UniProtKB/Swiss-Prot annotation:
Gene3D superfamilies, A to Z: Methyl-accepting chemotaxis protein (1.10.287.950), PAS domain (3.30.450.20)
MF-aspect GO terms: transmembrane signaling receptor activity
Originating species: Pseudomonas aeruginosa (strain ATCC 15692 / DSM 22644 / CIP 104116 / JCM 14847 / LMG 12228 / 1C / PRS 101 / PAO1)
Topological domain spans for side Periplasmic: 33-205
Gene name linked to the record: ctpM
Official protein name in the record: Methyl-accepting chemotaxis protein CtpM
Length: 561
């Protein structure tokens, strides 16, 4: 498909009607002139043929006039008078080669000018080159009164050339003779050819005039069309230039088209200005929102970085808590073993106390041994009390960590709520961490209650050991009262056995609780790892948003607002 510019279309719109008008006018003029020429040629032909008919009739009438008197005086069938008339008619000549001829009703040639050729010969069955019985028609035209016959005949002196001819015949019934004459019409055709040539020249002159006028009009319309097209296309060129500037990266949205007319082009320029104004406002709003988005993304990125760091610290602290719980579990196990050994020692002491009743003499030494063992038990109980205090300290650390974890999870949930849809997964993880921290606090409180009871039992055991020591000292000084004291010692040993059983049970419970705490801490550590991974993903998402904001800022920066 041919691509034309708008200027070319405007010029074509101006020139094509003129060309069509010139073509239609030329064609109409040519058709009219052709019709007029044909009519003129026809009229001229008829006029010239009429002149030739009149001339030919005049010649024949002159010839008839030369024999009219004899014809009037003669009788029907008077061959002598006819012979005299033939002799007179054969001598008549006119023009360059004009002559008179005669045939009878049987188409027998009676004379042909002064030439004796074929005189007395019948031409009834003779045809011309066109196959027409010419001589019959000549005789028939004279007899029926039509007189005129048009035909073709070889040109005298050049038999190969056929020329049109016109004959006029007149029938003389008394003599049964048709006389007539013929003239060539080639002169008429020559005149007609000249007339046609003259008409063709006039038509050519007229067409040339029309073409010249059309050419002048085309030039004038071309100049006017160029001026109008330039005036029409100037705003369009400005619109295209502004659009090209915006598309090529210039991006100047402050430029406007001047509205210099109130036609469709002026309306187009006004519409373009309104369009650019709307885009200008949109780009300005996008630029402002891009700045706000950039600030929000930077804040979110900083918060994500802080959350990531906080979760890393919490992970480290959780590892420390797990280590402390493992140590506490080992200490509780040692306490249980010590309690078991104390129980065994108490039983042995009981046996020895029973033996002391039977063997008074060896009671002092055994009492001293018992005092030493009681002192060792007191020392072990002191160590147990110190271990319990360590467990209390560790539980305090665990409680503090749980509280800090709860606060961190709360802050993480708040930050996730601020992040909106992107922080929903992080908020779920933060809620799980808070739940785990709450459970840790509850377990810590339960352990604290157990340890309080363990401390009370330990204090009681320490007091009992102290009293046993004092009693042992008294027993060493008062060996005489050994029997009575042995009963008290037996009772005290039973109490010690019960306390040791309680200590062992408490130690076992402490071990179980420590293992439960250890599992909880490991779960917390796993949750913290998940939260840390989510925090890293949130930080990565924040960095991606920051990059998108920067890219959007660069895109908006391409426009001049």
């Amino acid at each position: 498909m041919m691509r034309l510019t708008l200027k070319s279309k405007v010029l074509l719109l101006a020139m094509v009607p003129v060309l069509l008008f010139a073509l239609v006018l030329s064609g109409g003029a040519v058709l009219i002139l052709k019709k007029q020429a044909d009519a003129e040629v026809k009229d001229t032909r008829e006029r010239l043929l009429g002149d030739r008919r009149a001339e030919l009739e005049h010649y024949v009438q002159i010839a008839m006039g030369s024999i009219q008197a004899e014809y009037d005086r003669s009788a029907n069938g008077d061959l002598n008078a006819r012979a005299e008339a033939i002799a007179r008619l054969s001598k008549i000549k006119y023009g360059k080669d004009g002559y008179i001829f005669g045939y009878d009703s049987q188409v027998v040639r009676l004379f042909r000018g002064d030439s004796p050729v074929d005189v007395g010969k019948s031409f009834r069955d003779r045809r011309d080159p066109s196959g027409v019985y010419l001589n019959r028609e000549l005789v028939e035209a004279g007899r029926n009164g039509s007189h005129y016959v048009t035909y073709t005949s070889p040109l005298p002196g050049n038999e190969s050339v056929m020329v049109p001819k016109l004959s006029y015949t007149l029938y003389l019934p008394k003599w049964d003779m048709v006389i007539g004459s013929a003239i060539n019409l080639d002169g008429v055709e020559a005149q007609l050819v000249e007339i046609k040539q003259d008409i063709d020249e006039r038509i050519g002159t007229l067409i040339a005039s029309i073409v010249g006028i059309a050419g002048v009009l085309l030039v004038v319309l071309l100049v006017i069309g160029l001026a109008v097209a330039n005036a029409m296309l100037r705003p369009l060129h400005q619109i295209r230039q502004n659009l090209d500037d915006i598309a090529a990266g210039e991006g100047d949205l402050t430029r406007r088209l001047p509205v210099t007319s109130y036609d469709e082009l002026g309306e187009l320029a006004g519409s373009f200005n309104r369009f650019v104004e709307k885009i200008h406002g949109l780009v300005r709003q996008i630029a402002g929102m891009t700045g706000d988005l950039k600030q929000l993304v930077e804040q979110m990125s900083a918060q994500a970085e802080r959350s990531e760091q906080a979760m890393e610290r919490q992970r480290h602290e959780t590892d420390q808590v797990a280590t402390a719980i493992n140590e506490m579990s080992a200490a509780a196990h040692e306490v249980a073993q010590s309690a078991q050994r104390a129980a065994e020692a108490a039983q042995q002491t009981d046996h020895e106390g029973q033996a002391a009743k039977r063997v008074v003499d060896g009671s002092i030494e055994r009492i001293h041994a018992l005092v030493d063992e009681i002192r060792d038990s007191g020392t072990s109980l002191d160590s147990l009390q110190q271990d319990v205090q360590s467990i209390v300290s560790v539980l305090g650390v665990i409680r503090s960590i749980a509280e800090q974890t709860n606060l961190l999870a709360l802050n993480a949930a708040i930050e996730a709520a601020r992040a909106g849809e992107a922080g929903r997964g992080f908020a779920v993880v933060a809620d799980e961490v808070r739940a785990l921290a709450s459970r840790t606090q509850q377990s810590t409180q339960e352990i604290q209650g157990m340890i309080d009871r363990l401390q009370q039992g330990t204090n009681a055991a320490v007091d009992a050991m102290r009293r046993s020591g004092e009693a042992g000292e008294g027993t060493s000084n008062q060996a005489n009262q050994a029997g009575d004291s042995l009963d008290a010692i037996a009772q005290l040993i039973a109490t010690i056995n019960a306390m040791n059983a309680q200590i062992a049970s408490a130690a076992e419970e402490q071990t179980a609780v420590a293992e439960e705490i250890n599992r909880s801490v490991h779960q917390i550590a796993g949750a913290v790892d998940s939260v840390a991974d989510e925090a890293q993903q949130g930080a990565q998402t924040a960095r991606s948003l920051a990059q998108l904001g920067q890219g959007l800022g660069r895109l908006v920066g391409q426009f001049r607002i």
